[in-house]
Amino acid sequence: MKKNVAVIGSSGAIGNAVSKILLDDETVQSVYNFSRSISTNTSDKENRIYIDIENEESIKDAVDKIPQDIKFDLIFVATGILHNENDVYPEKSIRDISADKFKKVLMINTVGPALI
């Protein structure tokens, strides 16, 4: 039986690489790619669904777009943040830690994936 796979965070480097490998795998029936960046499907077995793991409503909306009869054989979570272009970066001192930055990192790296 062919597998159904979900890749959460498929627009990042790791998620995108995993998705490409799965799309080329003949034992995989369908790949559901979840990300904030939605583009055109590259394969008949690919399904792209918008998700923002910092937003609980977005997670619920993404789940609602999965057909009821789909059961995933593998869920690969490739979300995460160490730094971004704005205000989140690796702390070099305890003074660099702020509540807002800490909340953002926890939401993306821990809470969001747990809600999925």
Descriptions of predicted regions:
Residues 76-90:
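Conserved NAD(P)H cofactor-binding loop of Rossmann-fold oxidoreductase domains
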Residues 65-70:
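Glycine-rich phosphate-binding loop signature in dinucleotide/nucleotide-binding domains
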Residues 95-114:
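Catalytic Tyr-X3-Lys loop
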Residues 73-76, 103:
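Conserved catalytic-site loops of classical short-chain dehydrogenases/reductases
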Residues 43-58:
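Rossmann-fold cofactor-recognition segment
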Residues 23-41:
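Conserved glycine-rich Rossmann-like NAD(P)H-binding loop of the short-chain dehydrogenase/reductase
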Residues 8-23:
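N-terminal Rossmann NAD(P)H-binding glycine-rich loop of SDR-like oxidoreductase domains
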